[in-house]
Amino acid sequence: MALWGGRFSKDPDQLVLEYDACIGMGERMAQQDILGSLAHARMLGEQGIIPKEDAEAIVRGLEGILSDVRAGKITWSVDAEDIHMNVETLLTERIGEAGKRLHTGRSRNDQVALDNHMIAMDQCKQTVSLLKGLISLLLETAREHLNTAMPGYTHLQHAQPVTLAHHLMAYVEMFLRDARRFNFTCEMADEMPLGSGALAATTYPLNRERVAELLGFSAITENSLDGVSSRDYFLDYIYAASCCMMHLSRFCEELVLWNSSEFRFVEMDDAFATGSSIMPQKKNPDIAELMRGKTGRVYGDLVALLTVMKGLPLAYNKDMQEDKERFWDAADTLNRSLEVFSAMFASMTFRTDVMRRSALDGFANATDCADYLVRRGVAFRDAHRIVGELVAYCLDAGKTLEELTPEEYRRFDPAFGEDVYGAISLETCVGARSIPGGPAPQAVAAAIASAEKKLAAL
Ligand code: ARG
């Protein structure tokens, strides 16, 4: 008979048991569930709500179950529906009557909320630690490439030259923000919901602050209805995960492009590429592509859980049991992606010579050429048109701006002097963009120093 079977004249249909059970997902919260019960039982004993000896027996029993769970010795059963009732049933089997007092002043509704809060906080910490590893790796690579010129793009067209360090630091900024989002999500989840009961708290004199303290929470939830029916902390996590996957997917897309024969900016390590079953020459950047694809799945988790929660009346509704699969799918996908991305990135080779050649190509210095004329007194709008005409001329003549003769320059505007070549060289173009946030080596070095401080503060 189910733990709640008293008012029923029949056992649940087998179809119901299987459809309703969530022990598959519940297994992953077994440790949090037992830790929560340990704190609850200790508090019940301290408050004299249950006899001290019973509380002690429960604590010993739960500690035994916890160590068996950690040792992988326990198989949970679908018949007991969820992790909460599985643990309680096992406890009573092991310690007898005292086990039946554990659930005093508690409901599975606040119990699952507690487990969820703990899991969300654990996963935030796990994700932040993976992000920190990736950020350190990117910083290390950026430090080596302060002077590695490459084209910067808009519309995927050569725009203005930047450096590889500057490009990588853009991702460092994104991942630093992601890590802060997860830390904020952890802060938001840091409220202890036990004591909310099924929905309307309880008449027992529970010491909620004590439970919070035993479990390391900094606060308790302030409203029992909200305590059992909020899933914001999971949604916050999945949103942060979606954002982080979006950043990874942009990086992956660039690596796919950079690895193509058209770009050849990077060479994927053989260990992180796969071949074709028919085309012997192929070496495909599958891992980067797959990660781009998995981003869609995490977005799906976010929309799915938002939709589960949409329009639900207060307080607990069984719909909410769908939360765990979406949460774990997002957390597992993201954490694994961060791990794989870091390994893939660490094994890649950058072809700095190709990047430099490409930066010299495609008129990435045309803006600097116009700025040169401006310094010579020409209005920017006129300078823009003159250099546009120069570019059209170069395209016809099959030349770059650096290859034009002084006479050719002067044909377009008498303000051009011999010093134009210095003004449009790659080093000048990059080096002159030295304001904070710019690609000049000293500006990027400053950005790296600032990112290191932010990383240390995470
Ligand atoms: N297994 C449920 C969940 O994961 C918690 C139990 C509450 N169920 C209930 N019928 N009151 O959300």
Where are these regions (language model features)?
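Short alpha-helical "patches" and their helix-cap loops
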Residues: 53-58, 133-137, 182, 258-262, ...
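Hydrophobic residues in alpha-helical segments
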Residues: 45, 69, 142, 251, ...
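A helix-coil-helix interface module used to build multimeric assemblies
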Residues: 1-201, 206-213, 274-275, 286, ...
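Glycine-rich cofactor/substrate-binding loops
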Residues: 1-36, 97-98, 279-458
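Short, well-ordered beta-strand elements within core beta-sheets of diverse protein domains
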Residues: 40-50, 163-166, 235-243, 368-377
